[in-house]
Amino acid sequence: MAAGVAARTLRGLAVAGGGETSDSEDDGWEIGYLDRAAQKLKGPLPTEEKNETFKKALTTGDILLVKELLNSGISVDSSFRYGWTPLMYAASVSNVELVRVLLDRGANASFDKDKQTILITACSARGSEEQILKCVELLLSRNADPNVPCRRLMTPIMYAARDGHTQVVALLVAHGAEVNTQDENGYTALTWAARQGHKNVVLKLLELGANKMLQTKDGKTPSEIAKRNKHVEIFSFLSLTLNPLEGKLQQLTKEETICKLLTTDSDKEKDNIFSSYTALGDLEIFLHGLGLEHMTDLLKERDITLRHLLTMKKDEFTKNGITSRDQQKILDALKELQVDEIKFGELPEVTKLEISGDEFLNFLLKLNKQCRHLITAVQNIITELPVNSHKIVLEWASPRNFTSVCEELISNVEDLNEEVCKLKDLIQKLQNERENDPTHIPLIEEVSTWNSGILKRTALAVCGFGFLLFICKLTFQRK
């Protein structure tokens, strides 16, 4: 009984990727007894017994017995109870030698069971990346199509990206896999890699031309998916305006791409491509995003921080050896980073005697709306701000600088609150005088009540904004 439980447990490991399960509980496979000694046929076997022996030879990885059974006439594409072929099973456990033997004997590399292809099974197998890579390479060499999706429209490259297999992703693209295909939920291979936190896969996909702006069905980009799943570093460089790696390998031929991707020493490749993205400061990320990596050493030698770089004048750029072309890239990036200031010039000139009540009401409504926007902005900052300092990826200035700015903000909000209270008192005084004027014809009660309500809401919004800034100040002080 214990052996049966173990067999069922290990059988689950051979289920094809994406959660595709067998339609039959009693599938006839006994997976897990890989330490059995190689066996030989003692004589001709009945067909039913031969099939059972074939299954056992496959599950134990007995290559010699598999060859002997194939020589005896058993079909290399035998279909067992739940529809899997021997090749699909071999791919699911990343048995490279078994895959090679079966393919050499004519096994169909393009077979699928309910749209679950052998290539998808290999890409989602539970094994080392080296074994998976070799199995995938063998299948591709026998013309397995890398763009055939499963029932959920996931292609092999999505499974490889989801499981963090960088080299497998590169190999699939080299054989024609579409990088930007989307599954039933709108996920691309890049989205899956970002969701699972596989940084090297994300970088490789960007290098291979992945579109980081494609959205899922719920309107999320890969960077937003990474942020939602707490992968802050991936979110940081996916959010960059430019991508220095994008399309780097797209112009190479298939053979050149395979050679470049698979013969390069993995450690050297990481040093040349990925090391610049590990433990980066904000200056390095900014420069990489603009394709200005060559400026990193120059700026560090001169102790130029990102804050200093972003506030430089033209003569300072030239003085520090920054070329006109590089200057323009930085200035263009600055334009994108700028936030529109609140424009109060459009508000009516209250001092004019001919101003109407509607114009003044419009002024108050706009002021109230701006206050609400400010409150929402601070609430978002409080929500997104990391609680622990070790979660901050970019280099930050001293928290004291932020605290001092918050203190100044609180002071300004208190002043604003005081001025709004004065405005309210003044309007209330004018209202009282008009009500006591015997020549005044009173307005409709509803309008007066509504105007008073607007003033109250404005005052409450300003007070609420001050309270939120006070909370923000306490948050920074705790840090």
Swiss-Prot record:
GO CC list: pi-body
Domain of life (superkingdom): Eukaryota
Keywords, alphabetical: ANK repeat, Cytoplasm, Developmental protein, Differentiation, Meiosis, Phosphoprotein, Repeat, RNA-mediated gene silencing, Spermatogenesis
Matching InterPro entries: Ankyrin_rpt, Ankyrin_rpt-contain_sf, Asz1_SAM, SAM, SAM/pointed_sf
Domain SAM: residue ranges: 276-338
ANK repeats: 49-78, 82-111, 114-148, 152-181, 185-214, 218-247
Positions of post-translational Phosphoserine modification: S22, S24
GO biological process: cell differentiation; male meiotic nuclear division; regulatory ncRNA-mediated gene silencing; spermatogenesis; transposable element silencing
Location within or outside the cell: Cytoplasm
PROSITE patterns hit by this protein: ANK_REP_REGION (PS50297), ANK_REPEAT (PS50088)
Protein role: Plays a central role during spermatogenesis by repressing transposable elements and preventing their mobilization, which is essential for the germline integrity. Acts via the piRNA metabolic process, which mediates the repression of transposable elements during meiosis by forming complexes composed of piRNAs and Piwi proteins and governs the methylation and subsequent repression of transposons. Its association with pi-bodies suggests a participation in the primary piRNAs metabolic process.
Subunit structure: Interacts with DDX4, PIWIL1, RANBP9 and TDRD1.
Protein name: Ankyrin repeat, SAM and basic leucine zipper domain-containing protein 1
